[in-house]
């Protein structure tokens, strides 16, 4: 049985929730069959929005930070899942090279790295940290908020060019916790004898949100048929616009007209189900991450009325990458609250196992806004006691 998260949404069960609960045995079997055909991501985190009438993933991170925000009670589950995941790729693994993001001054992110090292060390692996940054030329100590140290070491290629590791450390598996927004690292390309997880093409230099949601659209149709619900209740509508330049206004007409089309589709669904909320669209950089390059739009005219500050925010994202492609996503309200502040659940998986989650809470935001923004904090999600593993 998959552990059940405890939700902050109180009140009577919505029709969607009833259907999911009633179909639990069929859902478990469906997942079992799907995992036999498809390889799950090595690990991921999924942002969910729960509007009661609709429960949908709105973002999936294949290089998840934030493991430090999970409840420590879930650590044994993470270790168990990590063991199973590593055994798939390298049953004889002894050494694991973990490659974190480059922003080593972010204390919260470093705590995530510490937790990941803890998880994989408890599987029995030797774990060390590597970097492809040209600034890391020797073992470099990185101070943690609690006064302890991490050591970051330069990645080197083996003499035959077929493996990568550290000077005196030959890993079976290389685990990326770096989303490669700035481009693919040449030092990890064309490795023939090691598993690089997730694969390089999962990084933002290649991956696009619009491709992800096109694939999810197919999955949602199958799943909706299985539990007898409209797939729309599990899946946000989306569209895509390319050749955008927020600074010189090029592509603006295309963006505004596509926002109009999407809003009309959402209004039609809201009318069908008697939903009184006001529809909105979230415009995101198609290769965006860290909550950057995101804006909420309730009317197409807002696209043409962006001020300089808003344009600057949309034009450039992580690692200075310029935005030229955007995904337009149906906005999903969140009706969940923690201590009267708006909240959304973020669920973490290793391989096919749910290993925990937390509420992203933001007192400065409303139910129709992006919560991954300044002012947010995290509250670990508990699992329902009777389902914990």
Give names to the regions the model predicted:
Residues 80-81, 104-277:
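Conserved N-proximal alpha/beta basic substrate-recognition cap immediately N-terminal to
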Residues 86-103, 374-389:
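Conserved catalytic alpha/beta cores of large enzymes that bind or transform nucleotide phosphates
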Residues 39-42, 120, 167, 339-342:
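Short solvent-exposed loop/turn micro-motifs enriched in small/polar/acidic residues
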Residues 95-98, 174, 281:
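Conserved hydrophobic helix-helix packing surfaces used for dimerization/oligomerization
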Residues 1-28, 38, 44-45, 51-56, ...:
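Low-complexity, highly charged intrinsically disordered N-terminal segments
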Residues 26-36, 324-332:
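Short Pro/Gly-enriched beta-strand edge/turn motifs at strand-loop
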Residues 54, 257-280, 286-383:
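Phosphate-binding site of ATP-dependent enzymes
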